[in-house]
Amino acid sequence: MSGKAWRGTAEAAPIAGVSKPALLHRIEWHTDGPQPVPVSAEVLTLVTDPPASRERFLRTAPDLSADWFSDLRTTVAALRAYPTDRQFPVHDAEEYGYLLSATYRRPVPADCVPAFGTEHIDLNWQNITAPRFCILDMEHWCSAVTGYGAAYLYLTALEVPAVADQVREALADVLDTPSGRYAQLVAAALILRNLTRLPDPGRLAARLRTYTDTLLT
């Protein structure tokens, strides 16, 4: 685990408006021996709701209420407004350019222009709960293209169109912007890269290719 992910939960503790477990206590130490190993332990408030999915890619529709989508919107907006200098690999303008060029082999349209803000880069269906919304793991948040978290959640719901439509409607103010469209291309490219190593029974890769074609034309 990278150093940034290692302290992600602790560094997220002051962020108001994000639905997440509260950090109660944290301690770091090193094991004894000729090659000490760093160890961290955290105590968080209990989350009783289960993950919305057993996989990061949504296969079946979970129980999602209007309150759930309201809390999702509030969380995404609160995180976006929180300043950070946290950085993770891939999530910078230069790396995005390489990624999109390698994935799509064509220019990015003029209406897809990245802005940067604070995003959760692992906002997936296995990392959020239902029927009440909560992000379980706050390790991977950082500066990224604005809209990345929303884009990742939306695109990984495409196998369940009714839920994908709800996510898109709830987060349209982010997704339907120049940066939101760019974020969708980035998120789709990273998902496609992951799918080369994972089973794809619902043909998510094909759905992503079809969808990104609409963004690129």
Regions found by a protein language model. Give the residues of each.
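A conserved alpha-helical element in kinase catalytic cores
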Residues: M1-A52, L58-A81
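A conserved long alpha-helix in the C-terminal portion of kinase-like catalytic domains
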Residues: E11, L155-T217
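Short catalytic/ligand-binding loop motif for oxyanion handling, primarily in non-cytosolic enzymes
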Residues: P51-R54, L99, A144
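An alpha-helical support segment within catalytic cores of ATP-dependent transferases
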Residues: S65-W68, L72-I121
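Short secondary-structure transition/capping segments
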Residues: A66-R80, W125-T129, C134-L136, V186, ...
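Short runs of predominantly hydrophobic/aromatic residues within well-ordered alpha helices
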Residues: L72, G147-A150, Y182-L185
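Active-site acidic catalytic loop and adjacent metal/ATP-binding pocket
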Residues: Y104-Y148
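Active-site Asp-x-Gly
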Residues: A130-D173
